């Protein structure tokens, strides 16, 4: 579960390394985000020469959470870290590579470009 002020690792090569959640999008008063949800973030740590700069406000989609998610068959999937991918307004990623595995739940929300770039879909 990702909420306001949560810091996440960025799992792409957009230039951001770490982001801080400002807001969870999707309905008024929504408190938490899970895998596949869009959040508004600010970049706290960035690589020099990247597309995204430190202090920039960006949108991102959550691809891994420590709390995990329950699937329809009753199984759970959890990851070792909270991670996101920086996206544009049309749901396409700003980076050209994705690092680490992503959850299959992204397919339900039509993030096909992220799934195709990911090295592993769990």
From Swiss-Prot:
Keywords: Ribonucleoprotein, Ribosomal protein, RNA-binding, rRNA-binding. InterPro entries: Ribosomal_uL14, Ribosomal_uL14_bac-type, Ribosomal_uL14_CS, Ribosomal_uL14_sf. The keyword Ribonucleoprotein applies. GO terms for biological process: translation. SMART domains: Ribosomal_L14. It comes from the Bacteria. The keyword Transcription regulation does not apply. GO terms for molecular function: large ribosomal subunit rRNA binding; structural constituent of ribosome. Pfam families: Ribosomal_L14. One of its GO terms (cellular component) is cytosolic large ribosomal subunit. SUPFAM superfamilies: Ribosomal protein L14 (SSF50193). Gene3D superfamilies: Ribosomal protein L14 (2.40.150.20). CDD domains: Ribosomal_uL14. HAMAP family: Ribosomal_uL14. Part of the 50S ribosomal subunit. Forms a cluster with proteins L3 and L19. In the 70S ribosome, L14 and L19 interact and together make contacts with the 16S rRNA in bridges B5 and B8. Binds to 23S rRNA. Forms part of two intersubunit bridges in the 70S ribosome. Belongs to the universal ribosomal protein uL14 family. This is Large ribosomal subunit protein uL14. It comes from Staphylococcus carnosus (strain TM300). The lineage of its organism: Bacteria, Bacillati, Bacillota, Bacilli, Bacillales. The gene is rplN.
């Amino acid at each position: 579960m990702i909420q306001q002020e949560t810091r996440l690792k960025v799992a792409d090569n957009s230039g951001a390394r770490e982001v801080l959640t400002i807001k969870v999008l999707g309905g008024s008063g929504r408190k938490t985000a899970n895998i596949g949800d869009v959040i508004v973030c600010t970049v706290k740590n960035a690589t020099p020469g990247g597309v995204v700069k430190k202090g920039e406000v960006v949108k991102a989609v959550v691809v891994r959470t420590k709390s995990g998610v329950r699937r329809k068959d009753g199984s759970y999937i959890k990851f070792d870290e909270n991670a996101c991918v920086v996206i544009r307004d049309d749901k396409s990623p700003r980076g050209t590579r994705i690092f680490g595995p992503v959850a299959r739940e992204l397919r339900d929300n039509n993030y096909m470009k992220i799934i195709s770039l990911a090295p592993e879909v769990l």
